[in-house]
Amino acid sequence: MACRIIEQYRHLKIFGIKITPHFHDVTEGLVTILEESGFSVYEETNRETSKDTSRMLRAGAIKVYFAKVTDTTLEEAFFEILEHIPSKAPIICESPALRNYIEPGLFIIMDSPGINKDKDICHLQKLPHVVFNMDNIGMIQPLPVTFQNNKWTCNK
């Protein structure tokens, strides 16, 4: 979904962000911005991998940032990334846990009835959000998402 929105609005010069609690090895193309105790922030420069950050670049994001965080450093890492993004720039951020700290312009939950869900997102579903179904999202052209007045909205 993130890549679909980026591709649809690539002319807006969107910045992508991916935040994960998984501390995988650094891959080729990740340029270190900051490494602190509990989190690391990188800029993705490799468009050729199957990682979400590379896919965001291929979809048309002007820059993509990647952070590895713990629960206690997530917010700090996010604000570090924002230091590298112009104010009022459109941002697509993939991080369900960030929703516990930040009120986004639009929070999208992807639903797929046929897939076993490993993550418990009941607490996120109680917050304002929009749900898209993964089984039929490919048929929706264009996506009912817009960026107006420096804010993402959905006219679903």
Q: Language-model segments: which ranges?
A:
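N-terminal phosphate/diphosphate-binding loop that engages ATP/GTP or pyrophosphate donors
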Residues: 3-69
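Short, ordered loop/turn segments at secondary-structure junctions
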Residues: 19-22, 69-70, 96-97, 135-137
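Conserved protein kinase catalytic core
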Residues: 24, 74, 100
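Short, well-ordered secondary-structure micro-motifs
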Residues: 27-30, 77, 103
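Short secondary-structure boundary/capping elements
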Residues: 47-48, 73, 90, 116
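Short acidic active-site motifs
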Residues: 52, 77, 120
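Active-site rim loops that border cofactor/substrate pockets in soluble metabolic enzymes
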Residues: 61-87
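Conserved catalytic-core segment of NTP-binding enzymes
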Residues: 83-90, 95-156
